[in-house]
Amino acid sequence: MKLLEDRIKKDGEVLDGDVLKINSFLNHQVDPQLMMQCGEEFKRLFADQKIDKVLTCEASGIAPGVMTAYVLDVPMVFARKKKPSTLNDAVYWADVFSYTKKVNNKICVEEKLLHKGENLLIIDDFVAQGEAVKGMVNIAKQAECNIVGVGAVVAKTFQGGSDWVKQHGLHFEALASIDSFKDGQVHFGKEN
C-alpha cells in the first residue's frame, strides 16, 4: 500500500535491533484516516473470504483491527495481555513473547466471545517474528474457529513471522512488506 509506505518513509524511524518506530501514526498516536484506509485495503485483500469476526491483540492491533471490522461490518475481539479483575469467566490463554519489549505475556480472550466454527480474520500492527500471531492462532484453535487469513499493517519479512504464517497454510497479506533496514533506511519488498 503505497500510502502506508510513503508514511513510513516520512515519519518512521529505524532503531537499533531492527525495530521500526512508527509512533506518530500507529503505535502511540493513531492517524484514524490512515487506519481507515488500511481497513479498506484489508477488506479488498480478503474479499473472497467469509469473515464473521476480526481478532487482534492489544494495544497497537486495536486501531487497524477496529477499522477493518468496521468496514467489514463485523465485531472485533482483542486479546488482552492481562486478565482484568472484571473478567471472571473462562478464558482462552496463549503465551506470547514481545520482540520490542523483550517480555513474555500471556494473552487471553474470554471464551464466550469466540464460537466454534466462526471465521476469523486476524489483524496485527506488525508481524516480525510472528509471536502475537502465533498466540492468536493458538487461541483461535482452542475456540475451534476457522482462520480465514492474517493481515499485517507492516511485515518485517526478514524476521520469519510471515513465513511461519504461510507455512501453516494461512492466507497472509501485509500492507507494507519490509525486506531490510540498511543504513537507517527502510527497504520495502513486494512480497506479502
UniProtKB/Swiss-Prot annotation:
GO terms for biological process: purine ribonucleoside salvage; xanthine metabolic process; XMP salvage. Transmembrane segments: none annotated. It is an enzyme of class 2 (transferase). Its main location: cytoplasm. SUPFAM superfamilies: PRTase-like (SSF53271). Pathway: Purine metabolism; XMP biosynthesis via salvage pathway; XMP from xanthine: step 1/1. One of its GO terms (molecular function) is xanthine phosphoribosyltransferase activity. It is found in: Cytoplasm. GO terms for cellular component: cytoplasm. It catalyses: XMP + diphosphate = xanthine + 5-phospho-alpha-D-ribose 1-diphosphate. Its EC number is 2.4.2.22. Xanthine binds at residues 20, 27, 156. InterPro entries: PRibTrfase_dom, PRTase-like, Pur/Pyrimidine_PRTase, Xanthine_PRibTrfase. Keywords: Cytoplasm, Glycosyltransferase, Purine salvage, Transferase. Gene3D superfamilies: 3.40.50.2020. 5-phospho-alpha-D-ribose 1-diphosphate binds at residues 128-132. HAMAP family: XPRTase. Belongs to the purine/pyrimidine phosphoribosyltransferase family. Xpt subfamily. Homodimer. Converts the preformed base xanthine, a product of nucleic acid breakdown, to xanthosine 5'-monophosphate (XMP), so it can be reused for RNA or DNA synthesis. This is Xanthine phosphoribosyltransferase. It comes from Lactobacillus helveticus (strain DPC 4571). The gene is xpt.
